[in-house]
């Protein structure tokens, strides 16, 4: 199954500063944004995962067995 990617209008890549080059898709309940010019990626876990993190802590990753 092909992953449907959407472009984010007006977004600028924080790494290469290219505008209108950011594509977004959802994979395993995680939003992924990637620059199609330089390959820079940003990931954000879903709200449920963020709610389990205490205020002064950070999460490196969440294990989802398949």
UniProtKB/Swiss-Prot annotation:
Pfam families: DUF2387. InterPro entries: YheV. This is Uncharacterized protein YheV. It comes from Escherichia coli (strain K12). The gene is yheV.
């Amino acid at each position: 199954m092909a992953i449907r990617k959407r472009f984010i209008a007006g977004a600028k890549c924080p790494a290469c500063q290219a505008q209108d080059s950011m594509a977004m898709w959802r994979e395993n309940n995680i939003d992924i944004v990637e620059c199609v010019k330089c390959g820079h990626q940003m990931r954000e876990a879903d709200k449920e995962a963020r709610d389990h993190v205490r205020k002064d802590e950070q999460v490196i990753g969440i294990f989802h067995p398949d």
